[in-house]
Regions:
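Positively charged n-region of N-terminal signal peptides that target proteins for export
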Residues: 1-5
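Soluble, non-membrane globular domain cores that form compact, hydrophobic packing
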Residues: 9, 13-286
């Protein structure tokens, strides 16, 4: 009986609600002091801090937010927001929704960028946002110093989702990749998807990839055909061209656990080219 209780205790410890959370501590920064208490927000209270944006964060499996404010003798301040999401992919998702593709990117965490009075970065399951006030000409230096110390306290920096390396490089707009967690293209039956924007010879288009198991992929194809009133043939792996009333003609390919496709392109040769390039990229990922 004691052995059973011990095993159950270990299981509860490993899989309990706090198993994924690190014991994060805000860093000490020379010349700065924390002002007031650290604020903590959970899913049901997040709206108290970011009312208008809370729903978007919750879509990406937000778990917890910790907020600290620092002041110096010159009455400048830095506010550090540390958002924890359920997985690194979810953290990337919300980060990708807010980053600007032409931002001033820096080597911090998995990726980060700095603008006037703002520094945001991604590291593991954490999305960190820093805002500065009255920091003057030293603003960027101050933000970088804070970011490095916060990143060190969070530990391993992680990396961007590996599947992003499968996207063809030719024509891809740098840092345009996004992760859509739910309702891709506005359809509840389409699971989460990674996307990237492209431009080639004046033609702008988008590539996407959805990852599931074989049954999940088959169900998505079948429901998409039903939704668009497309002819329902024997659902099998291969190429599909779907006339979507909201998104135009979409060409996609299903193979194994992936569905990948292309949007906003009428040139069939260009579609074929990029679907093949994408297939090659996914093969390398295996």
């Amino acid at each position: 009986m004691k052995t059973v209780c011990l095993v159950l205790g270990i299981i509860i410890f490993l899989w309990g609600p706090g198993a994924e959370a690190k014991d994060f501590k805000f860093p000490e920064v020379t010349g700065w002091k924390q002002s007031g208490e650290i604020q903590t927000f959970i899913p049901k209270t997040l709206f108290e801090y970011i009312d208008g944006a809370a729903d978007l964060y919750l879509m990406y499996d937000f778990q917890e937010l910790k907020v600290a404010e620092y002041l110096n003798e010159k009455k400048a301040s830095v506010i550090v927001d540390v958002y924890r999401h359920k997985t690194p992919t979810q953290a990337f998702g919300i980060y990708s929704q807010e980053r600007l593709s032409d931002a001033n990117f820096i080597n911090i965490g998995a990726q980060g960028y700095v603008e006037k009075n703002v520094l945001n970065f991604l590291t593991g399951s954490y999305y960190v946002k820093l805002n500065s006030f009255n920091t003057g000409a030293e603003d960027e230096e101050i933000l970088l110093n804070f970011a490095k110390k916060v990143s060190e306290n969070l530990g391993e920096k992680g990396r961007l989702p590996f599947i992003l390396s499968s996207f063809p490089e030719e024509g891809k707009k740098k840092n345009s990749e996004k992760f859509i967690n739910k309702n891709f293209l506005g359809y509840s039956f389409l699971y989460s998807a990674f996307t990237a924007d492209y431009e080639l010879s004046g033609t702008k288009f988008k590539l996407f990839v959805i990852e599931s198991d074989r049954k999940g992929c088959k169900d998505m194809i079948q429901k998409y055909l039903q939704q668009t009133k497309s002819p329902e043939k024997n659902i099998a792996e291969g190429l599909y061209t779907i006339s979507d009333p909201y998104h135009g003609e979409i060409e996609l390919h299903w193979q194994g656990k992936y569905i990948w496709g292309i949007l906003n392109v009428s040139d069939t040769s260009l579609r074929s080219k990029y679907l093949k390039l994408f297939e090659v990229g996914l093969e390398k990922k295996k």
